[in-house]
Structure formats: C-alpha cells, structure tokens
C-alpha cells in the first residue's frame, strides 16, 4: 500500500508541475518580454529560474537522512553492478517483461507530447493558448489518474491492468489523431493523461514489489536508462508526420503501441499472472 501511495503521490506532484510550470513560465515571459516577441530575456530568465530550482532540489535531497537496511556488504565497481542488474533482468521474466512494457509507451505513447504543437497548429488551427489548454487537459487527467492509482493498491490482476492500460493508451492516441474538434481533442487527451499516469506508475510500483531489495536500486536504474530509448521511437514517427501528416504520425504511433502491447502481453504469461504485485 505504501509503495502504491508513494508512487501515486509522486506522479500527482509531477503532473501538477506540468500544469503550473508552463503557465508560470508563460507569465514570466509575458512580463519581462514586454510584448516584444523577439525578446529572449524572458525565456532566458525562465531557464535561470529552472536551473536554480534544480539546484534547490538537489541540495534538499542531501538533507534526507534514512539509514535503511543495506544488504550489500561488498564493494564492487559500477560496471559489475550494472552487469549483475542486466543479468537479473534477463533471468527474471516478470521484471524483464515489466521493463519491456514500460519501454513501449516511451517509444510510441509519448510521441503525442512531441507532435502536439504541430497538431494544435495544423489540425486544430489553434494558437499558443490552445496548445496550453491541451497540455493542461493532459496534466489534469494525469493527476486524476495518479489519485485513482492510490485507491488501486488492493486491486487484483495488476498484470492485466498494466497490459490493458498500455493498450488503451495506444488506442486513445489513435483516436486523438482522428479528432478535428478542439473540445473533443481536449477530452480525449485528458483521458490519455489519465490512462498513462495509471500505466506508468502501476508498472513501476509493481516492479519494485517484484525485485529483491538488494537489487531494487540497480533495477530502477536500468528502467530509467531504458527510457532514454524514447528518441528511437520519435524519429520514425516524426519522419512519418513530416512526409505525410501529423495525424498519420500519431495514428501510426497509437496503433503500434496498441498492437505491440497486446502482442508482448500475450507472449508474457508471467506478467499477466501478476496479482497483487507479489510473487
């Protein structure tokens, strides 16, 4: 319960920042640019503030004191630790399957974040304000999804939930690509935020429950490192969007996420059998 609630709270805070951050940045730029659309001072100031916030965040972590219960007594090189983590992932069908299912959304599901400005301009004929509202809709849906996850710690068949929300995420992206009405697009993208928050947070929560305590930090590092594969999905989807249309690019990414999630879910019975997140 504590892990699920912690992941839900972390996701809710992150998505709340997605709503507040762009609005605050736009407000700062508007004030210091003084209506000059060619001014770079306001944008530069936003990056300075962002850097300071990162610094404050890093310093704050240094003051967290928690002795924990370390289980590793030998000092080894970082390379050997990483090799052991990769062997653990390969040898565990459940952990490897969860990491694979977490990679697919980063390859295809998050393409909507990259293509959203072009979709808002080319398809919805919207301006910066419309794009901001679409992003707010996604963030608001993600917050609701995070809060919903906090109530799902006792839900059974979590493996099916992870696979199902991943497939639904892809289906919603495909549906979003066919919309041309601003209100409908906002509603659909809100559902995308809702489903994506549940999928990513539940996957990571279940993964932590499946991994041995001595390996937890290294496995989470492998999981985070795998998210760096996102450009591999954005490049072909962006090429499709450029050579055909934004709608076709989004439709392709949505269908790819839907079908690949269902395919790998069908090929990984151990993941489907995950019940309460415990072995």
Residue positions per predicted region:
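Residue-level signature of transmembrane alpha-helical cores of multipass secondary-active transporters
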Residues: 11, 18, 23-27, 101-106, ...
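Coil-to-alpha-helix initiation sites in intrinsically disordered, low-complexity, charged segments
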Residues: 7, 11, 73-81, 214
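Glycine/proline-centered helix-kink
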Residues: 15-30, 114, 146, 230-238
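Cytoplasmic helix-loop-helix junction between adjacent transmembrane helices
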Residues: 1-16
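Helix-loop-helix hairpin linking two adjacent transmembrane segments in secondary transporters
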Residues: 15-60
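C-terminal transmembrane bundle of multi-pass solute transporters/carriers
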Residues: 47, 51, 55, 83, ...
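Recurrent gating helices in multi-pass secondary carriers
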Residues: 94, 102, 106-114, 197, ...
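Juxtamembrane intracellular "pre-TM" segments in multi-pass secondary transporters
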Residues: 66-100
